[in-house]
UniProtKB/Swiss-Prot annotation:
This is Polyamine aminopropyltransferase. The lineage of its organism: Bacteria, Bacillati, Actinomycetota, Actinomycetes, Mycobacteriales. Homodimer or homotetramer. The gene is speE. One of its GO terms (biological process) is spermidine biosynthetic process. Catalyzes the irreversible transfer of a propylamine group from the amino donor S-adenosylmethioninamine (decarboxy-AdoMet) to putrescine (1,4-diaminobutane) to yield spermidine. The active site is at D379 (proton acceptor). It is a multi-pass membrane protein. Keywords: Cell membrane, Membrane, Polyamine biosynthesis, Spermidine biosynthesis, Transferase, Transmembrane, Transmembrane helix. It catalyses: S-adenosyl 3-(methylsulfanyl)propylamine + putrescine = S-methyl-5'-thioadenosine + spermidine + H(+). It comes from Corynebacterium efficiens (strain DSM 44549 / YS-314 / AJ 12310 / JCM 11189 / NBRC 100395).
Length: 519
């Protein structure tokens, strides 16, 4: 007996252990890619462009890896252990390295592409190496090779399924992106160590075997350090993203939530995007809320706005009743704790009913018994990805308008009227297409945001103005509101095609605006 050849009874055990190892490695490989998708969504918005690059790049890299490994098939055992060591280390560190790169140099699509390509190439090299070991080990002959290839592919695909389930249900919620990827890398490396020590130990020269084991142990130690110390590493990197000290940071099931504070200036960020600053949030909040209230308004629906600031203003009217629909329960938790001084405990007021659900799904399902409201306020982050674009679509506004009482009004935050004018006017056109009787665009200056825009939707004849019993405000007056409806000659109203579920035009509008602003 020589080379990879095994006794018959050992061959069966060898084969099944190898198939289990294949499944584990496949699971780890998919977890690395899902970690990149999740990180892209958290840092860059993770729209169709990034996701397509990751998926297509990964699949293409699999083929490249299968080609590049050909010269090394003469040494399948040695090469397999080297590939798994690199894969576990690169995949396990990928999320952390990309996060740190983003913190230092900002958005870098090339780093995402590079990480995807490296992982894909290494994963693509696995099956040719495994098949070579199986064939040389005489675990299959001409009659059974096809069956074994099918079994090998089945193990690979089932392993990918396990990885696809483990990431959203176990690794991400329990460990987060950085530690989750590192944990997958450790599992990958431990599987490779098992294969090396149990299945391939007698097939390698002693010196090569020792070097392979030492390399695997060093890689495991590196990822173990990341698992233990990742919170501190991430905290240091995260601070580079924000000008003020971070006092709270948490990755929820939906987004990265960060609160910073310097002196009296407290700021909320979701996925790196500023939601408000206590220096000037009153300008934004008053401009969002008060134009949407008719004199008879007594019921209001807030979509988004989980910070509680819009609810705070509405509760200044004693007979107001509010339904708040917020996707992320952890934003509500932050609003009820760290942000409590800013919203005055609005989310805990008995006049406010808080619902944690996707607003589109909730409206479509007739949530709250299909109740209609006198005012609706859509206070959501900008539509920087296709998921968020659903809530800026013609279909969404149609659902929302169906929940307005006769004579009711709806206000939608509409991004920067100056930096992203196409987004601003696209939202106006989309609301008109959804059936708004009158759409009145307006904009105000919010120092931390710049020139910020809103759309007021109401019945024909609706005008910008404050209701008669409006309490004393810090910023908004009838005169300010009248001026808010005036636009310069370089930014006049324009008719654009609506943004829809089928064609979320508003996402590209936003990206184009940011690109042009950065030129």
């Amino acid at each position: 007996m020589s080379g990879l050849e095994q006794p018959a009874e050992l061959s069966r055990v060898w084969r099944w252990l190898l198939l289990v190892s294949v499944a584990i490695c496949a699971a780890s490989g998919l977890v690395y890619e899902l970690a990149l998708v999740s990180l892209s969504a958290s840092l860059n918005g993770g729209g169709i462009v990034e996701t397509s690059l990751i998926v297509a790049g990964y699949v293409a890299a699999l083929g490249v890896g299968a080609i590049l490994v050909k010269p090394f098939l003469r040494w399948p055992a040695q090469t397999f252990l080297a590939v798994e060591t690199l894969l576990g280390l690169i995949g396990g560190l990928s999320a952390l390295v990309l996060y740190m790169t983003f913190a230092v140099v900002g958005q870098n699509l090339w780093m995402l592409v590079l990480a995807t390509a490296l992982i894909g190439i290494l994963v693509g090299a696995e099956l040719p190496l495994l098949m070579t070991m199986i064939q040389r080990g005489r675990l299959a002959d001409a009659r059974t090779t096809g069956s074994l290839v099918a079994t090998l592919n089945a193990a690979d695909y089932l392993g990918a399924l396990l990885g696809g389930l483990a990431w959203p249900f176990i690794l991400l919620p329990w460990l987060g992106m950085m530690r989750g990827a590192a944990a997958a890398g450790m599992i990958n490396l431990l599987a490779a160590l098992f294969v090396g020590c149990v299945l391939l130990r007698h097939l390698l020269p002693r010196a090569q075997f020792i070097r392979a084991v030492v390399a695997l142990l060093v890689a495991i130690a590196v990822l173990g350090t990341v698992l233990v110390r990742s919170d501190g590493i991430v905290a240091t990197a995260r601070q580079q993203l924000y000008r003020d000290p971070v006092i709270y940071a948490h990755q929820s099931d939906y987004q990265d939530i960060v609160v910073t504070q310097r002196g009296a200036d407290r700021r909320l960020y979701l996925n790196g995007g500023l939601q408000y600053s206590t220096r000037d949030e009153h300008r934004y909040t008053e401009s969002l809320v008060y134009p949407g209230l008719s004199d008879s308004a007594r019921t209001a629906l807030i979509i988004g706005g989980g910070d509680g600031l819009a609810a705070r203003e509405l509760l200044r009217f004693p007979d107001m009743r509010i339904t708040q629909v917020e996707l992320d329960p952890e934003v509500i938790e932050v609003a009820n704790t760290i942000l409590l001084p800013d919203n005055g405990g609005a989310m805990q007021d008995p006049r406010v009913t808080v619902i944690t659900d996707d607003a589109f799904t909730w409206l479509r399902a007739g949530g709250d018994g299909g109740q209609r409201y006198d005012a609706i306020f859509v206070d959501l982050p900008d539509p920087n990805n296709d998921t968020m674009a659903r809530l800026y679509s013609q279909e969404f506004y149609t659902l929302a308008l169906a929940r307005l009482n006769d004579g009711g009004r709806m206000v939608v935050q509409s991004s920067s009227a100056y930096t992203t004018p196409d987004v601003f006017w696209r939202i106006a056109s989309t609301m008109s297409a959804a059936g708004c009787g009158a759409v009145i665009p307006y904009h105000v200056h919010v120092p931390t945001f710049g020139d910020w825009g809103f759309q007021l939707c109401g019945p024909e004849g609706t005008e910008l103005g404050l209701r008669g019993d409006t309490p004393s405000l810090r910023f908004l007056t009838d005169e300010v509101l009248a001026a808010a409806g005036v636009f310069g000659a370089d930014n006049q109203p324009r008719e654009l095609e609506p943004s829809t579920l089928d064609h979320p035009r508003v996402v590209e509008d936003l990206r184009r605006g940011y690109r042009q602003a950065g030129e």
